[in-house]
Each structure stands twice: as structure tokens, then as C-alpha cells.
Amino acid sequence: MSSLVSLEQLCVEFDDRRVLDNISMELEKGKITTLIGPNGAGKSTLVKVILGLQKPTSGKLVKAKKLKIGYVPQKLKLNDSLPLNVIRFLNLAGKYSKQECLDALRLVGAEHLIKSNMHRLSGGENQRVLLARALLQRPDLLVLDEPAQGVDVQGQIDLYDLIESIRHRFDCAVFMVSHDLHLVMAKTDDVICLHHHVCCSGSPATITQHPSYIALFGNAARESLAFYHHDHEHHHHDLSGSPVSGDATSCSNHNHGHHHHD
């Protein structure tokens, strides 16, 4: 797999306060990487760095040449007083034909929404339209910030299934910020646990056993996910039907105290 984005000892400071400390990571073509961490851990800042919206204070950021990034924001604020249907919304970021818009919407199962009012979409419908907008660019890297926020449980399952299918269809990298721990563990290749620095990173099966993960998310999260692993690993497959890997995990032993996840 080839690296699309590489961070080496990257730091970001605001008013002498270090928000990101010595971050080293890679986003690879064809892989889903999920970022987790408590509120105020620097997750949004890291996303901005990768999108090119925040300059690092120090360290190195390397992106593949001509890298195309599709971005699905956590929240989309639209002026309620301005009528805006889906096809007009999709064309705000560029000029696309009706067929191109239909094709993108069809990929996410939302072609029937092309003439719908953006203000009347459900949480799940809204996320699918945002995903379609990102796919219009045929991205090499898809960045999703809390993609399942405001979506019901079944909608979350469907959305993560969709993201996984998009990864395979486009052979793109996916970088996702999420707090839906159960669903994340089933659908991701790698997990990065962030609390200003990288506390631990690696495969889902090993990350949940690490003391840094337990310190951030508590024993309840570990026990709940232990049940998830027991329920699925005895079949040697995760929820997506893929074999469970035993990849090694790289972790650092920092004491964080107990925090609630966002």
C-alpha cells in the first residue's frame, strides 16, 4: 500500500499551548483509519492539518502529488431562509451535470433525493448527500468528521457499510473521526487514539486492550468491546465478513486519567 499522507513529529501550538504534540502517522491507499479521543484532544485540529486548513508549528507533513481530498464535515449549517435543493447544493462546490450528480447520489443510495429540499432531509439522508458531494471529486482520500452524528442506529450501520464499500470501489484512503466505538471497531483497519499526542495506535483487536485506551474510555468500553470481540472473533471474522487480523500495535504508556469520549 502506498502512503498518501505522512506526518512526522508534527506539532501545533496555539498561544504557547501545544494542541498536537509530536504526531507521526500515515494514511495509506485502500485503508480505513479511525481517529478516536476525548473532547479537546486535538482531533479537529489534526483534521484541519490534513485538509491544509491549519499550518503545523513544527514537524513534517508530506502529501502525495496531485492528491484529491473529499471532505464530509461534522455539521453543515445552511441558511433556512434560502431554498436549496440537493442538485443545487452539489453544484455549490463545482459545476457538475445532472447525470454526474445522479451517479454520485446513486453510489450512496440517494438518487431519489436529487430534487429534495436540503432543509427537509433526515440526518442519514443529509450525510449521504454530503458523501455524494465528496465523491464527485473522485477523491484519493476521503476525510469524514463524525459521519454518523445525528443518525439513528440502523442508519449508522448502513452508513459505515457504505463507507467500507466506497473504500473498495474507489481504492481510496479513508480517515474518519468517530466516537461510535462498536461500529468503528468492526469497520476500520487501524485506530489512532489521540490525546494531544498519539496514545496508542494499531489494529482494533489490540488497541482496546491497551492501558491508554482504557484510561481514556474506561473499563465499561473495554468490557463492552470485549463482548463484541468474543461474539465475532470465535468466527474469525468481523462484522464486515473480513478475517480478524492480529496486527501488532504501537502504543505509548501515558497516564491520562479518566475522560468521557466525545
UniProtKB/Swiss-Prot annotation:
PROSITE patterns: ABC_TRANSPORTER_2, ZNUC. Its EC number is 7.2.2.20. GO terms for molecular function: ABC-type zinc transporter activity; ATP binding; ATP hydrolysis activity. It catalyses: Zn(2+)(out) + ATP(in) + H2O(in) = Zn(2+)(in) + ADP(in) + phosphate(in) + H(+)(in). GO terms for cellular component: plasma membrane. The keyword Nucleotide-binding applies. Keywords: ATP-binding, Cell inner membrane, Cell membrane, Ion transport, Membrane, Nucleotide-binding, Translocase, Transport, Zinc, Zinc transport. GO terms for biological process: response to zinc ion. Pfam families: ABC_tran. Gene3D superfamilies: P-loop containing nucleotide triphosphate hydrolases. Residues 236-262 are annotated as: Disordered. It is a peripheral membrane protein. It comes from the Bacteria. Residues 5-220 form the ABC transporter domain. ATP binds at residues 37-44. It is found in: Cell inner membrane. Part of the ABC transporter complex ZnuABC involved in zinc import. Responsible for energy coupling to the transport system. Belongs to the ABC transporter superfamily. Zinc importer (TC 3.A.1.15.5) family. The complex is composed of two ATP-binding proteins (ZnuC), two transmembrane proteins (ZnuB) and a solute-binding protein (ZnuA). PANTHER family: METAL TRANSPORT SYSTEM ATP-BINDING PROTEIN TM_0124-RELATED, ZINC IMPORT ATP-BINDING PROTEIN ZNUC. This is Zinc import ATP-binding protein ZnuC. It comes from Vibrio parahaemolyticus serotype O3:K6 (strain RIMD 2210633). The gene is znuC.
